[in-house]
Structure formats: structure tokens, C-alpha cells
Amino acid sequence: MSRKPIIAGNWKMNKTLSEAQAFVEAVKNNLPSSDNVESVIGAPALFLAPMAYLRQGSELKLAAENSYFENAGAFTGENSPAAIVDLGVEYIIIGHSERREYFHETDEDINKKAKAIFAAGATPILCCGETLETFEAGKTAEWVSGQIEAGLAGLTAEQVSNLVIAYEPIWAIGTGKTATNEIADETCGVVRSTVEKLYGKEVSEAVRIQYGGSVKPETIEGLMAKENIDGALVGGASLEADSFLALLEMYK
């Protein structure tokens, strides 16, 4: 089965509104065709509405970096999936290691978010990944499989076929370290095998799996050549327009 690549930036808590607007203006007319690749930027919620307006008519898609699992209520400071979708946003990132570590999000929280995001009409980008300690102990497969099983609990086969899973080894995020292409592909293969165990081969062949962790323009082509890697979730290299476009150059 042919899976369309998806290259997604994750700005985290960076940029001002004017900087975000300038970025969209710089990239929107220079992106490869969406027939070849999905080009996505994950931005702080404050910027999503003006970015959605500016990107009209372009190939750029947008992701929120988080959402809550309720669509309304007394949840001060949270953003609902329904409100995010109403802005025209296509994707919502959930389960990032920074959310798990700093905001104590659990697998159960992340699973509830996945269900709410699908119900609202967006697509989750579900993150998973292990610490250096887990990696060095040889327990990566066990850890990542557990995160995937918990994150997908109760989702339908159709939903899982359409979502995106991002494998990000925590020890390679923002550290300058990166897993070898072989390690990245092997662990993305573990993710795919876990999906196959839960939902069957047809679903596992449909789900798109990204690698994330210090991905750069000079390393992305080797990663994308691997069998189980369908895209990248990119932090630092997505912050500048030139660098983001360089990540997509192979698809032009």
C-alpha cells in the first residue's frame, strides 16, 4: 500500500504572531504538491486562526500542538478539539513527551484526547517514545508498544487507519542526537507490528508513522527511504521558512 508522506513541523512555544504570519507568507507559494506530500505546521493555538486565513489556497496544512478531551466546560486555559477544528485546522498533536513529562499527561488522558479529536473531525498525531534509560536497557519495543496499545484503546479500525503516529525517542529531541536510520526504522516497525496485532494487516499498512528527533534537511532523505517511516515530526528545523522548505525539497 502506498502511504502519502507527511512532514510536520512542531514549533512548540516559539514565535510571535508577526513571525508566524511572516513564515506562512514565505512558504505558502513554495510548497510541493499535496499529491506528493502533506506539508504541516504545528503552531501555538494563539496563531492558528490568522495562519489558517493566510494559508488559504496553498498546500499548507495546520496542526494544533495539544487539545483537551472535552468540547466545552469549566476548564480554564484549555482548547477544545471542536473549537480548533472550527478554525480549519486539520491535525492535533497529542502525547508529546514534553506534555507527558511537564504536564503529567497519562496514556488514559491521551487516549481520551484521540477519541475527542476524531469526534470533532480532525486527525490526531499520536506521539510515542522512550527515554535514554529505557533505550539502553533494551526495552524500547516493550515501552513503545505499551504506549500505542493504551493510546489506541477503543478506537475503530477506520480511525486508526487514518491517524498518524509519531515515534520520537526522548533522548533525541532537541539534543542534537538522532537515532540511526536503522534504529528509527526498526522502532517504527515495532509501532506498525503493534497496530497489526491490534487491528490487522490492512490497518497496519494504512497507518502513517513519522520519525521525530533532531531531524534536519541533511538527514531527512535517508530516514524517508526506510520501509516503515512515512514522515517526520520536526522541531528546530521547522522554525525557519528556508529550513522547512528544505525538508520538503525532495518532493518537488
From Swiss-Prot:
Catalysed reactions, as listed in the record: D-glyceraldehyde 3-phosphate = dihydroxyacetone phosphate
Chief subcellular location: cytoplasm
Pathway the protein takes part in: Carbohydrate biosynthesis; gluconeogenesis; Carbohydrate degradation; glycolysis; D-glyceraldehyde 3-phosphate from glycerone phosphate: step 1/1
Gene3D superfamilies: Aldolase class I
Gene Ontology BP annotations: gluconeogenesis; glyceraldehyde-3-phosphate biosynthetic process; glycerol catabolic process; glycolytic process
Pfam families the record matches: TIM
Enzyme Commission (EC) number: 5.3.1.1
Entry keyword Mitochondrion: no
Purpose of the protein: Involved in the gluconeogenesis. Catalyzes stereospecifically the conversion of dihydroxyacetone phosphate (DHAP) to D-glyceraldehyde-3-phosphate (G3P).
Quaternary assembly: Homodimer.
UniProt-recorded name of the protein: Triosephosphate isomerase
Protein encoded by which gene: tpiA
